[in-house]
C-alpha cells in the first residue's frame, strides 16, 4: 500500500469499487430490459432509464474520479477542477432523475385515467433533456468562476511561485464550500428533497383515500387490493428514506465545514457520507425496477437467453402494470 494512502482511504476505495461493481451491471440490466421488451417503452419507463443511465455514469465515471480525487495527485488547479466537475454533474443528474420519478409516481396516482394523455413520450423527452441541461449548469458552475482559485493563487504567490498553481488535487481545495452549501445544497438538493416529501405525503393521502373508497366497493377480494396498494406505499416510503439517508450526511458535513471551520470532522465520517451518496445508485435498480413485474420477467428472460443454455419463453407483453387501478 502506498504510504500516502491511509487505512481509511484504502477501505473507502474498496467500498467504492464494490459499489461500482454492483451499480453498473444492475443499471445496465435495467436499460437492457427496456430495450428488449416493447412493453417497457412508455413514458413511465423513460424516467427509469434516465435514472439508470445517470447511475451507470456514477459507477463508471464518478466513482473512479472520486477515488482519484481522494488519493490527491499533484495537478494544475484547472485540471483538478475538471476532474471534480463531472462528479457534480452526474450526481446532480441522479437527484433530478429521482425527483422526476417521484413526480411521475404522483401523477400515476393523482390522475390514473388521464395519465397517458398528460405524460406523453414527447413531454417525457423534454423532462429528460431538462434534467441533463440543469445537471450540466449546476455541475459546471465552478468552471465559470465559483471556485477556490483566488485563495489558491494567493497562497501560490506568497511562496514566490509563478504560473498556474500546482496543487494536491482534493475536492475541497478546488470546489468552494459556499458553492456546495448555498448553491448546490440549499438550491439543488434540499428543495428537491422537501418537494419529494410533500409529493409522497400527498401520494399516501391519495392512496388512503382510494383505499377507503375501494374497500367498501370491492367486497369480493379486499385483501388483494390492500396488498397491491400497500406495496406501492412501501415502495414510496423506501424511495424517500434511501434518498435522505444517502444524500443528507455529506451535505450536513459540508455545512459544518462552512459554518464551523474549527470543528473537527473524523475522516471516517466523510468517507461513509461519500459512499452513501454513490451507494444510492446501486440501490436504485432494486427500488425502481425489481418491484415492477414486467422488469422481473424481462430480467429472467435476459438471464436465460444470454447466460444459460436454455432460452426463456417469449415475454408476455400483456402483463398487468403495477399501477393504481384506474
Curated annotation (Swiss-Prot):
Give the membrane topology, semicolon-separated if more than one: Multi-pass membrane protein
In this protein, the residues bearing a glycan are 148, 159
- List the Pfam families hit by this protein, alphabetically: 7tm_1
Gene Ontology CC annotation, any one: plasma membrane
Q: Which UniProt keywords apply?
A: Cell membrane, Disulfide bond, G-protein coupled receptor, Glycoprotein, Lipoprotein, Membrane, Palmitate, Receptor, Transducer, Transmembrane, Transmembrane helix
- Lipid attachment, kind S-palmitoyl cysteine: 309
Keyword rRNA processing present in the record's keywords: the answer is no
Q: List the disulfide bonds.
A: 80-169
Residues assigned to the Extracellular compartment are 1-10, 70-80, 147-176, 260-267
The record's principal subcellular location, in a coarse class, is membrane
Q: What parts of the sequence cross the membrane?
A: 11-33, 47-69, 81-102, 124-146, 177-201, 236-259, 268-292
Location within or outside the cell: Cell membrane
The molecular function GO annotations come to: G protein-coupled adenosine receptor activity
Q: Which residues lie on this side of the membrane: Cytoplasmic?
A: 34-46, 103-123, 202-235, 293-326
What domain of life does the UniProt record list for this protein's source? Eukaryota
**Any idea what job this protein has?**
Receptor for adenosine. The activity of this receptor is mediated by G proteins which inhibit adenylyl cyclase.
- Family indicated by similarity: Belongs to the G-protein coupled receptor 1 family.
Name of this chain's protein: Adenosine receptor A1
Give the species: Pongo abelii (Sumatran orangutan)
